[in-house]
Amino acid sequence: LAACLCLAACGREEEAPAAEEIEEGVVLNVVTSYGVDDGNRRNYETAVAGYEAATGNRVNDNSSVSNEDWKSRVLTDFMTGSEPDVLFYFTNVDADPFINAGKVVSIEEIREEYPDYATNMKESMMAVASDGKHYAVPSSGYWETLFVNRRVLSACGVSIPGPDYTWDTFLEDCRRIKEAGYIPIACSLYEIPHYWFEFAVMNNGSLAGHMEIPVVDDAGVLVDDPASRKWIAALEDIKELYEAGYFPDDTLTAADAETVAMFGNGEAAFLIDGSWKLGYFTKNFARRIEDYVVAYVPGKGQRPASDTVGGISMGYFITRKAWEDPAKQAAAVEFVFHMTSEEVLGTFVTTEVTALVNGTETSGLSTIQQSAADANVHITGLAEAVQDAISGEAKSELFINIPKVVTGQMTAREAVEAAIRRN
């Protein structure tokens, strides 16, 4: 089948770029973060099925839920020559190892053969690599914020947080929730402390300076500056919450899925997570969906609760291996074209950020989706995650040591210094 197969997109026909004939029955090896527990897994499966039906090709899907182990496996596959044909992955420094190794193809190079590739995306919203080129076609974006279980809050006499929610009020709410016999914060410090760290950093700094990163001197000693001070203070805030007993009793051993279930089942009041959880709760906790509300992470210092974290952090890469395979090149291009078309991305986007030139239209939002849309109206500032601006090794070191910090085995300063030494 020709790579110029027409695909409908938002009520009009968009033609996929064509340079080569797609070999009949091509099998594409694809890796994404749309694992079985991802809220968009069903949308992903539907989109892949649509590609297979339209092209006659088959997708060998090796998707898994995104975490540090998954990232490590992806990078290891590139190192051993086992990389996929198409990869849906982070577009920040996490992608530097395989970009710098020449293992993926730039959009600029692809456009030499397929001029219309990714032209439905805003150039300004596509990630730029250190060489000044673009490599990933962006998918739907994200936001991170506070999810609340309104049933738990009601039982504890606590109000749903608004855009003026403060840290002091939050601490008082946590005290009341704990005294009422509920878990204040659903979080696995063992597996996913990421979200609490991100907002704790912003709470000890500002939106404008959020992307500032600590540094070490030539001797490997952490430099005392505003960036290092706010990172240290962030870890100390998390330690304060731990010592107060506001996390689950097994926060240092439980998996993220277990603590999220505590929130979903009405055992815990608060959860910081991302926009992808809208689909997750709709799929896995449909009977309780009315209990969940998207609210605001408590603000502290210069940060109001209406400043949040968000952006577009992931996209589709075509690997050099697929590009240089005559049997797979056009099939890989067609796959990315299909997955990032307005029609397909429209199924992934409800309240998320999008790079699509024409945007998407949504209707018939569920109660939790509508609460997200309502909360987003009050957003006063948006910053990308600063943790995504440090190396994978530095990030792993930082988050592995958070349990040590909260239990007093390591100081917050030591943890930040150890992480930045690996940056």
Where are these regions (language model features)?
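Hinge/lid segment of periplasmic solute-binding proteins
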Residues: 22, 90-148, 168-171, 196-202, ...
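Extracytoplasmic/periplasmic solute-binding protein
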Residues: 130-139, 144, 169-221, 239, ...
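Conserved C-terminal helix/tail region of periplasmic/extracytoplasmic solute-binding proteins
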Residues: 59, 154, 345-346, 354-365, ...
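Short, solvent-exposed loop/beta-turn-alpha elements that line the ligand-binding surface or hinge
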Residues: 108-120, 162-163, 205-233, 283-287, ...
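Conserved N-terminal structural module of periplasmic/extracytoplasmic solute-binding proteins
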Residues: 4, 10-96, 100-101, 111-114, ...
